[in-house]
């Protein structure tokens, strides 16, 4: 037997120390490793295929490599192999059949190139190889050789902008320290002693590798090197699905393969096969088997496979597999459907629970409503019982008001929903008629105001008030005032004399904030105004001793524009009375003066120009100007009307009838050697007769300046003649004084106008900053003597209602709204004041 195997290495090769030849005899080692799939096989290289046994081995490259074949290191010590015999083929244990059971592959069964390899250390390396093993040489003295040279490299780097101690690059982004190397502790493989990352690597790349991912990748690579993975019989892999996974799948995809109800009775004709088939639902199509056609040969039904993939089908039952898969799908769908049904039932339980809570709340509310209605019914029945004529304890108006207050406070919803009109008509109206049975409004105008105000807050419909309606059937209080209170007022107005206006005015002033607006308008338009109109027609200004303004003007705050139709006949009667009037009669001024602010400015000016100004012109025309004996009565009669007629009309009278005669007298006096001191006094005396407003008029100012010019010319023309000593100086002084007064008056007027403008600006700024809109309305009401007060217990859309004079208003975000005929209308503050006057 050959002993050549004793000189083989672990790979079954002859040492390269022997002759370059190979023995072809079969050895025990060959027999032992015949069925070993992990044995080392020699792959023929390109040179061996070309040259055969004459191919030379490459022994020049002495660097250690990671390949399976290594060059011999002749500098290493000699390693001897102990003599002995290997086990024979007879003693070889029987190989286990790897097809029966799959065993884990041990590390010894790996190819040699993939197992952990010992690193060459010590004597196993040549001297030329020791400097590269593991990169263990330190870089501590790297670049120290430049100390003994010119340092051209360092200089070039510095010229290009390199700074010692910083990294390379434009932004110094290069590394400063060299890449560190870490020496492995032992002789194991990479990763055998844990992580081999250096401190520098951990700082630059802090990402930590996942050990689970590394282990999973290792197991994946390990499974690829098992013996004969393609031909071995692997265990079948089963895919298990839990109920929770099926539920999650059903929640994600809500489409089921189960037939819908509307598609369950659809007739379907299948003509895809050789024969026509009729199905009565789409679900039957999904249950159709994919059975191959009988007419086709078996060879044409199966696609041929080539190469290693061509395998026999073995045991295959497609119908059985289809049925099993169908059962699995139906089971999954049933599980998903049951889960959805369960979720639906749970949601239904929650929904029914909420419905139960709502119905419980509704039931409690209905019980409270029934209880409240029962109590309200008891109170109404008690009132009805006490309203009977034979009742020993009859119901009074105050007690009835307290009952209604209780209904409004404690049972407001029931009180608001009930028919208050019918309730008030049945209970309150009889009591109210009994209360006002002996009432005389002109004698006791405030009688019943408190009790009516209380019933107004109890009975008045807020919704009707907010919409400005006047429907008697919808508001109990309006109907109460109209049917109970209004008859007493009609009766007393028919007996009232308009010339005795004070009692009626006081009565309406006391009730204006209580009664509805439309009822007040009815009283003024239908009852009061016809009486006044008839009395004005019967009035005669020449014979009546009572002035008409004494019984007309008290109605101005209440009626205002309603009295406009009376002004035209009054002016006509006054014009007729002034036809024979003379300015010496001062009674005309007393009669006309109260009407100056009542008539419009245009109508008043027209009345004055037509009836008064011509009379005053005639009076001035009769005036005689005599410096020695002057009679001033006619002049006083005219000037007395200064406040009644306009300044322009008065100045026109003076220009036409006074100043021509006055200047003519002055010229005549100056031409007869006058005494200039007397002329000066005469000039100043006439000027003092006019008011500052008249003197400030340009026409009057020009006339007096003309008189001064005449006096100056008279003094200057008598230069050679005899002249009173000091006359020229006196006239010059007078002229200078008068001109200075004119300038001072003009300056004072300008200063007053500037001060008034400044005061108005300050007043506007001061009033706008500290006060709100309600305070501003209150201030304006005080200035114009208008009553401004809140309406107790009345609101519109949550806003408090106020009475501004006889108008009902409310304020919303700086805007005042006035109650119109059908709705609330926004208005300005000035318009509100005009309507309230």
UniProtKB/Swiss-Prot annotation:
GO terms for biological process: biomineral tissue development; mRNA splicing, via spliceosome; negative regulation of double-strand break repair via nonhomologous end joining; negative regulation of protein-containing complex assembly; protection from non-homologous end joining at telomere; RNA processing; spliceosomal complex disassembly. One of its GO terms (molecular function) is nucleic acid binding. Its main location: cytoplasm. It is found in: Cytoplasm; Nucleus. Residues 710-734 are annotated as: Required for nuclear speckle localization. Residues 91-102 have a biased composition (Acidic residues). GO terms for cellular component: catalytic step 2 spliceosome; chromosome, telomeric region; cytoplasm; extracellular matrix; nuclear speck; nucleolus; nucleoplasm; spliceosomal complex. Residues 149-195 form the G-patch domain. The keyword Protease does not apply. The modification Phosphoserine is found at residues 2, 59, 98, 144, 210. A motif (Nuclear localization signal) lies at residues 700-705. Residues 1-50 are annotated as: Required for interaction with DHX15. Residues 1-13, 53-64, 103-116, 217-231 have a biased composition (Basic and acidic residues). Residues 1-21, 53-72, 85-133, 179-236 are annotated as: Disordered. Keywords: Biomineralization, Cytoplasm, mRNA processing, mRNA splicing, Nucleus, Phosphoprotein, Spliceosome. Belongs to the TFP11/STIP family. Involved in pre-mRNA splicing, specifically in spliceosome disassembly during late-stage splicing events. Intron turnover seems to proceed through reactions in two lariat-intron associated complexes termed Intron Large (IL) and Intron Small (IS). In cooperation with DHX15 seems to mediate the transition of the U2, U5 and U6 snRNP-containing IL complex to the snRNP-free IS complex leading to efficient debranching and turnover of excised introns. May play a role in the differentiation of ameloblasts and odontoblasts or in the forming of the enamel extracellular matrix. Identified in the spliceosome C complex. Found in the Intron Large (IL) complex, a post-mRNA release spliceosomal complex containing the excised intron, U2, U5 and U6 snRNPs, and splicing factors. Interacts with TUFT1. Interacts with DHX15; indicative for a recruitment of DHX15 to the IL complex. Interacts with GCFC2. This is Tuftelin-interacting protein 11. It comes from Homo sapiens (Human).
């Amino acid at each position: 037997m050959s002993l050549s195997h004793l000189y083989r290495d672990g790979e079954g090769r002859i040492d390269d120390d022997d002759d370059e030849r190979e023995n072809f005899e079969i050895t025990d080692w060959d027999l032992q490793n015949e069925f070993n799939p992990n044995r080392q096989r020699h792959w023929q290289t390109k040179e061996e295929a070309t040259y055969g046994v004459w191919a030379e081995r490459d022994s020049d490259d002495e660097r250690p490599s990671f390949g399976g074949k290594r060059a011999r290191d002749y500098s290493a010590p000699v390693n001897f192999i102990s003599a002995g015999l290997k086990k024979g083929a007879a003693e070889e244990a029987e190989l286990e059949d790897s097809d029966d059971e799959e065993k884990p592959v041990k590390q010894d069964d790996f190819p040699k190139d993939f197992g952990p390899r010992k690193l060459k250390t010590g004597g196993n390396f040549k001297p030329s190889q020791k400097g590269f093993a593991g990169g263990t040489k330190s870089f501590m003295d790297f670049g120290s050789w430049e100390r003994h040279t010119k340092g051209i490299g360092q200089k070039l780097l510095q010229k290009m902008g390199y700074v010692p101690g910083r990294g390379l690059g434009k932004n110094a982004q290069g590394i400063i320290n060299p890449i560190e190397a870490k020496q492995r502790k032992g002789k194991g493989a990479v990763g055998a002693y844990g992580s081999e990352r250096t401190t520098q690597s951990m700082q630059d790349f802090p990402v930590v590798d996942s050990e689970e991912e590394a282990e999973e990748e290792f197991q994946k690579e390990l499974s690829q090197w098992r013996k004969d993975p393609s031909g071995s019989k692997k265990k079948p892999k089963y895919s298990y699905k839990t109920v929770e996974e099926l539920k999650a799948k059903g929640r994600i995809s809500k489409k089921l393969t189960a037939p819908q109800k509307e598609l369950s009775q659809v007739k379907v004709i299948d003509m895809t096969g050789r024969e026509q088939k009729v199905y009565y639902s789409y679900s039957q199509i999904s249950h159709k088997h994919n059975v191959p056609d009988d007419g086709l040969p078996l060879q044409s039904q199966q696609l041929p496979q080539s190469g290693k993939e061509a395998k026999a089908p073995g045991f295959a039952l497609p119908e059985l597999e289809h049925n099993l898969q169908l059962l699995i799908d139906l089971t999954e769908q049933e599980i998903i459907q049951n889960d959805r049904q369960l979720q639906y039932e749970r949601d239904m339980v929650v929904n029914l629970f909420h419905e139960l809570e709502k119905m419980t709340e509704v039931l409690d509310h209905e019980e409270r409503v029934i209880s409240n209605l029962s109590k309200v019914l008891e109170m109404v029945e008690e009132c009805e019982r006490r309203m009977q004529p034979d009742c020993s304890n009859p119901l009074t108006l105050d007690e009835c008001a307290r009952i209604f207050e209780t209904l409004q406070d404690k049972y407001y919803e029931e009180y608001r929903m009930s028919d208050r009109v019918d309730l008030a008509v049945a209970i309150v109206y009889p009591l109210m008629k009994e209360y006002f049975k002996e009432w005389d409004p002109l004698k006791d105008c405030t009688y019943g105001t408190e009790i009516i105000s209380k019933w107004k807050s109890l009975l008045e419909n807020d919704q009707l008030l907010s919409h400005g309606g006047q429907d008697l059937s919808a508001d109990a209080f309006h109907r109460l005032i109209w049917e109970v209170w209004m008859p007493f007022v009609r009766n007393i107005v028919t007996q009232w004399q308009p010339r005795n206006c004070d009692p009626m005015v006081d009565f309406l002033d006391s009730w204006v904030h209580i009664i509805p607006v439309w009822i007040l308008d009815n009283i003024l338009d239908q009852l009061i105004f016809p009486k006044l109109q008839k009395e004005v027609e019967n009035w005669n200004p020449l014979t009546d001793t009572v002035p008409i303004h004494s019984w007309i003007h008290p109605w101005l705050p209440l009626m205002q524009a309603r009295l406009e139709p009376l002004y035209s006949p009054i002016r006509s009667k006054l014009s007729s009375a002034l036809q024979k009037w003379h300015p010496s009669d001062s009674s005309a001024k007393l009669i006309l003066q109260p009407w100056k602010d009542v008539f419009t400015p245009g109508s008043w000016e027209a009345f004055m120009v037509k009836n008064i100004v011509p009379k005053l012109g005639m009076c001035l025309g009769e005036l005689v100007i005599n410096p020695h004996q002057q009679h001033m009565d006619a002049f006083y009669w005219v000037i007395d009307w200064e406040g009644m007629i306009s300044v322009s009309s008065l100045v026109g009278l003076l220009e036409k009838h006074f100043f021509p005669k006055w200047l003519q007298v002055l010229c005549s006096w100056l031409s007869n050697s006058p005494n200039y001191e007397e002329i000066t006094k005469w000039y100043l005396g006439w000027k003092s007769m006019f008011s500052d407003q008249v003197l400030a008029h340009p026409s009057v100012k020009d006339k007096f300046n003309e008189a001064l010019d005449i006096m100056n010319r008279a003094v200057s023309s008598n230069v050679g003649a005899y002249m009173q000593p000091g006359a020229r100086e006196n006239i010059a002084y007078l002229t200078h004084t008068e001109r200075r007064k004119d300038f001072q008056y003009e300056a004072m007027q300008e200063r007053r106008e500037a001060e008034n403008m400044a005061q108005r600006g300050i007043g506007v700024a001061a009033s706008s900053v500290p006060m709100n809109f309600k305070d501003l309305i209150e201030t304006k009401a005080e200035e114009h003597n208008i009553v401004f007060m809140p309406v107790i217990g009345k609101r519109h859309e949550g806003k408090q209602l106020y009475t501004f004079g006889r108008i009902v208003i409310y304020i919303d975000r700086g805007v005042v709204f006035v109650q119109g005929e059908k709705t609330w209308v926004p208005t300005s503050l000035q318009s509100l004041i005009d309507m309230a006057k």
